[in-house]
Amino acid sequence: MKILKNVALLAMLFMSIVAVAQQDNVLLDRSFWKGDPDLKTVNQKIAEGNDATALNENAFDAVIYALLEKADDAIVKHLLSFEGNPVDKKTHDSRIYLHWAAYAGQTEMVNFLLDKGSSVTKLDSHGYTPLAFAANAGQKNKALYEAFESCGVNLLNEKNESGANLLLLVSSSLSNEEELNFFTRKGLKLNSTDKDGNGIFNYATKKGNIDFLKLLIKKGVDYKSSNKKGGNAFLFAAQGGRGYSNPLAVYEYLKSLGLDPNIVPKDGYTPLHRLAYNNSDPAIFELFLTAGADVNLKDAEGNTPFLNAASRNELAMVKLLSKTVKDFNTTNNEGQSALMLAVQRNNPEVTEFLLNNGSDAEVYTEGHRSAKDNKGNTIAYYLVASFDSRKPDEFDTKLKLLQEKSVQLNTTQAEGNTLFHLATKDNNLGVLKRLSAFNIDVNSKNDEGLTALHLAAMKAENEEMMKYLISKGADTKIKTDFEETVFDLASENELLQKQNTSLNFLK
């Protein structure tokens, strides 16, 4: 117990140090780099105390932002001269600077990093080398690929974890025969496929350039065959690209080729499952529904298109898909219903719609026993998990909606946690205060033998949450199963030590 506690405290201390390091650091403000600062300005900011090597909470740093915003090469090289910025520094998603330089199409910086000995084989957390990462982002700069070639990289061997080569990865961004020929002349085969048998036509449909798709068909590319998992191009079209969704015309074109919109692969994850998350064009949904796509079909994880829509999509689309829902209280493999997902991830409007149109509130309150997911959490757990400090009004509205349906908020959740435990674990005083009126036992122990106050003593960044719990009746004398008092736990909290927080109120 003590070992786990100390590990948790060290992790929190590290995050605190990172937060302090990047607080008010203008070099970690992307808008600063969008302003195209010169080297003199950058040096001035560094002299003022802005750390040129610090990573923010998402592991981005000044070098990355300078590369992404195409700052002058002299500035990037200067930043790379700092001891804390080695060429293979591990950053966001385990990427090194070569990933970012290639992604941004910064050929001169790519050459500079290669000359400095940067790894060309380093994989990011998604299994992409620097060059594969660039191709997947749509980089078509010939000089970029030739820079890697000159450094000994065999373009034919560059693939991601799915076995997609550079041609497949970049294909959704290609628009004409000249661009296509650059890659085929390098030896990349037009009929190459990934491990699942997906060819260039499928990959190109992610950003469906219909003229380019027609060019591929003219060149004899196979577009009709299903892949090894039983999928077709509709699945890739539904996937879209980063910040891009295909319009209706692309789906109509694929249908005109004789491809089936109602394709059901082996894992059950259909195009409708993917589109249900964020498609906002009712005509696209109608195309699939007319073709027989089923909003009730479960994929391998037990999710239906309707469950996906309830978790993220706008109310109008949820209403549209709800017309053919057989059971509003269907759950996925984790025991999560549409209402649970909507309460956690979507807006109050969708929550209210589900409560009033099919999500039977009695299911959640009958006999004062709330329906639980497979871990033992009720809808109240999902309410606490939904809190966003930027949108507190949404939480308050959802809370009111659930109160109107007499949902019990003092039911014990998974692992013996009360809502007080959950809010304290998240260090969320705002939620804690909102829950104080619901007759929750503030001194209840969870399965680890900890009260909410114990957790606050271990995790708190200051005394405020502990004092609030005490004001609500939390007992400072209750010990853990290891005979530790609240004072003992707080005394070992390095975040509190760092701030010289007085703990006399716990004695």
What spans do the regions from the language model cover?
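Bacterial Sec-dependent N-terminal signal peptides
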Residues: 1-25, 502, 507
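N-terminal leader/linker segments that initiate helical-solenoid repeat arrays
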Residues: 19-84, 88-92, 125, 491, ...
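Ankyrin-repeat-protein effector appendages
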Residues: 21-37, 155, 256-260, 324-327, ...
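Ankyrin-repeat boundary/"N-cap" motif
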Residues: 23-33, 54-67, 89-99, 123-135, ...
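Ankyrin repeat A-helix N-terminal signature
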Residues: 35-36, 65-72, 100-106, 133-141, ...
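Ankyrin repeat domain, specifically the short helix-to-loop turn at the C-terminus of the second helix
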Residues: 44-51, 77-85, 111-119, 146-155, ...
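Solenoidal tandem-repeat scaffolds enriched in leucines and small polar residues
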Residues: 138-273, 278-285, 291, 317
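Intrinsically disordered, low-complexity segments enriched in Gly and acidic/Ser/Thr residues
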Residues: 249, 256, 262, 267-270, ...
